[in-house]
Amino acid sequence: AEHVYRLSIAERPHIDFVVPPAGQPGKVGRFTLYGRNLPGGVDSGMVLEGKPLQKKEVTINLPGDAKARMNLSGTSPVGPRQAGFDGIEYRLPSPKGSSNPVRIFFSDAPVIGEVTAPNDRPTEAQKITVPCDYAGLFYPRRDRDWVTFDAKKGDVYWVEVVSDRLGAPTNPFFRVERVTKNDKGEEKVSTVKEVTESPVNVGGTLFNTTSVDPEYRFAVPEDG
């Protein structure tokens, strides 16, 4: 009699993911919801597990007070890998009822979205300004995205991918390359570092925070 469960069947919206997954606290952000039964949603052209997804743009006001920054409230469970991220829980309202909850995390830097133009080759790299949070999509499967930015000698950056810790079934990898030009204007590319994963567990066996998300401390050796 103690082993009970609840089965709910409804026409309410279902959100699969949000782009970007983070925004700056204290600001109003534009977000695109991807899912099914989204009121006013349009075809996204994407398919997830054989099912077409809709998309819908929404405006969300992210709280910026100190209390909100230190609180990760909501009804959905938070695993050890996500426990280090602050944010809010969001539900899309509709006449059929509110959607499932999704988390939108706080970013300390401006959020830059992936361009719609192709950026899956080095020659098509998207130019960004750092520091920033770059929000992209691994779509289609085995997608590659290239970005480029200017760096000065002596600058130090933390380059970090957050995907596995968002609950996505991914195994990210990134490469840092330096692009220089000779007197003729010809580009030369050299690899600085390839990073596959950073399996750091700060919680021990009782609170395992291990993730396959890669990170790298990039100390800029030369202007580039």
Regions found by a protein language model. Give the residues of each.
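Acidic, Ser/Thr/Pro-rich low-complexity intrinsically disordered segments
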Residues: 1-4, 8-73, 81-83, 130-224
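Short, aromatic- and glycine-rich surface loops/edge beta-strands on solvent-exposed regions
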Residues: 1, 83-95, 104
